[in-house]
Amino acid sequence: MGKRPIEDDAVASSELSRKKSKKEKSGKSKKSVIGEGADTNGHAPAAETTVDGSENEALSKAERKAAKKAKKEAKEASKAGKADAPTVENDEEAAKAARKAARKAEKKKLKEAEKTASSAPTEASSVPAQTLSSSNAGSYTEHTELAQLPQSEIDAFLTKNTMTIEDPKPAARKLRPIVNFKYLPVTDESQRAPFAGFTAPTPIQAATWPFLLSGRDMVGVAETGSGKTLAFGVPCVRAILSLPKDKRKGIKAVIVSPTRELAVQIYDQLVALAHPAGLSVVCVYGGVPKDPQVAACRKAHIVVATPGRLNDLIGDGSADLSNADYVVLDEADRMLDKGFEEPIRQIISQTPKKRQTLMFTATWPPSVRDLASTFMVSPVRITIGDNQSGELRANVRIKQLVEVLDPHAKEQRLLQLLKQYQSGKNKDDRILVFCLYKKEAMRIENFIRMKGFRVGGIHGDLSQEKRSASLAAFKEGQVPLLVATDVAARGLDIPAVKLVINVTFPLTAEDYVHRIGRTGRAGKEGLAITFFTEHDKGLSGSLINVLKAANQEVPEELLKFGTTVKKKEHGAYGAFYKDVDNTKAATKITFD
């Protein structure tokens, strides 16, 4: 009787040793599984050793504790003179308890190890997790020939085009501008067809493509006419084509534009890129029936839209942006000037949190910076030109002539200029004439037509159909003269506009810069002639600053009006207006 408990104790110890050996093998096997998972997620092997060591240590403690408890109970049973069967039963229960405790400890440690393995990569990439770059990382591979170019050539390209690239995320190797179309990664040579008429990418295209193809958020600050549409269009089409065919259904990209004319222009260029790839593009804007646009949205992959109409379609369920993970805000500064901030916020709220967001702007004021910080994650900022402050500047390739004259002499002087610049071999040269008000535009258009010139008009009183027809005729050269109000002053890419004439000075110097920006596009030179009268003298200081910044001659007659620059005022609230962001949380006040 006295020896039986000892033998049972030995049996129990032997069984525990056998189980321990089995669990150690299991632990090694699971260690390799954990190690493989850690390698997949980028963890160091040291972390694996720590997890395995702590696990074995915990298992050993649990087993020793259970064995000690079993031995103690066996001794107590022996002293009490219990029968063999109950003693064996108690020993078996003790061994069973030991095994259970060991399994419990093992499971606990495995769960902790799995939790550590899954949380570590999230912490390492917490910022990119809100952008498309997290899922698109590594999708762009630099062309071999581009990688082999001497750094001196890249530096010369950046210096020549006065390009500045600011990336808040440190990189082991900086992405090089795609300075030649052959370096652009395409899956099919037919995708290069839209570039057939160009010799090389524009500076904004060359600089932005590497970052956009890598899935990064980006802010592009560049003058109008710099080729921004293809800058965001090429990565847009490529991003959609990279998806499996069964996941391409629905709206995948949305481009927001401030005006109908600019939206149509973007649409035309994107169609040339998207249609050969089998992708559908739709353009939605107000002033036309909604039903055809609703039907088109159901089949569209890319939507180009003005803010108002797009929000209408979202509101009635006709446009679903829940899968639109490529978002472009074009002419962002102008959209804010036009009061579209809230509609923009509503549109972006309908898109996925995990998206790639792009913003193109001619200026970089605080309002645009605030908007970028709200919707973008670590955006790359690319500035073309020496205007690092982001203030509005005129294109230096445009020669600006300012004529100070009597208000009643405008029409006759306009007629002289038309005869001078549109006669003989230049009779088909495109000339854009700007007026301030709709009625003035109609009067000037009729005046020019009566003098025997072919002329069209574009202003707010015309229907969308007539505006589109006039613009198309002007672009195609059927009508070489176009009279417009500021509705056409920005964003329109009208090729080969030789001359811009400002019959009446606009309400702001910013509008003046955008007007004259219709010429001198795509690297070409242009000419702008502006009539300035005593009624405009309040803006003389601002105009003088624009002329000086572009190294243009300032007439003595203009200097007589003074160089004072008046404070920019709100159209409705004057100088008392204050821009307040209502979306920011109020300051919390606590009382003791």
Curated annotation (Swiss-Prot):
Cell location: Nucleus, Nucleolus
Chain positions of motif DEAD box: 330-333
Biological source species: Phaeosphaeria nodorum (strain SN15 / ATCC MYA-4574 / FGSC 10173)
EC numbers for this chain: 3.6.4.13
GO molecular function, one term: mRNA binding
Name of encoding gene: DBP3
Source organism phylogeny: Eukaryota, Fungi, Dikarya, Ascomycota, Pezizomycotina
Residues in Helicase C-terminal domain copies: 413-562
Residues annotated as domain Helicase ATP-binding: 209-382
PANTHER family named among the record's database cross-references: ATP-DEPENDENT RNA HELICASE DBP3
Positions that bind ATP: A222, E223, T224, G225, S226, G227, K228, T229
Bias type Polar residues, positions: 116-141
Region ranges (Disordered): 1-146
Name of the protein in its database record: ATP-dependent RNA helicase DBP3
